[in-house]
Amino acid sequence: MSDPTNPLVEEATKRSGLIWLALPDLPQPRAAWHLWHDGAAYVVTGGIEQPLPGLPEAERVTVTVRSKDKGGRLVSWVAAVSEVESGSEEWEAVVPLLAKERLNAPDGETQTERWAHEAFVMRLTPTGEVTESPGEMPAGYAAVRPVPSPATSVGKPPFMVGGRRRRPDR
């Protein structure tokens, strides 16, 4: 079987620390940290991990990758979604690598056991279908707006040292 992975898809996804997933029944894509390993992107969802509703049940999703240099959308590709079963050979190979990539884990050493019981490790395998790439972007406006969150702050900016003018000395 030939490898359907486009070199641009692999290189862009490997370099990017964040991908955007167009999940079923959601109005806009969700950001997700990931790991690229052996021709596929791996993400962890469920429990206290990143919320990606509908991903474990999905068969295919569209993945959008941004440019590491400019931050703009670089390539979008379609992925076949499959769950990595706990205890499988693939689990044993991928989960330690994912654990190293996971920042600020609340349980550190025991996170892999927690993932086995309450989270899903999902494999996103490129199908070979590239929906957007440089020179083939849609003409319409397609910027992703941030997901509403109670963690935003609105108010006056904090006091800045040296920000007020002083009276001249006499």
Briefly describe each language-model feature range:
Residues M1-P4, V44-G46, P56-V65, E101-D107, ...:
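Short amphipathic alpha-helical surface micro-motifs
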Residues R15-I48, P53-L55, V61-V65, L74-W77:
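Short beta-strand segments
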Residues S67-D69:
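Short beta-alpha junction loops
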Residues M1-Q28, A151, M160, P168-R170:
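Short, conserved active-site entrance elements at the starts or edges of catalytic domains
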Residues G72-R170:
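Charged, gly/pro-rich active-site loop segments
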Residues T5-L8, Q28-R30, I48-Q50, G108-T110:
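A generic local structural motif
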Residues E10, W33, T112-R114:
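Short secondary-structure boundary/capping segments
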Residues M1-L8, A31, E85-G87, K100-N104:
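General structural signal for secondary-structure boundaries
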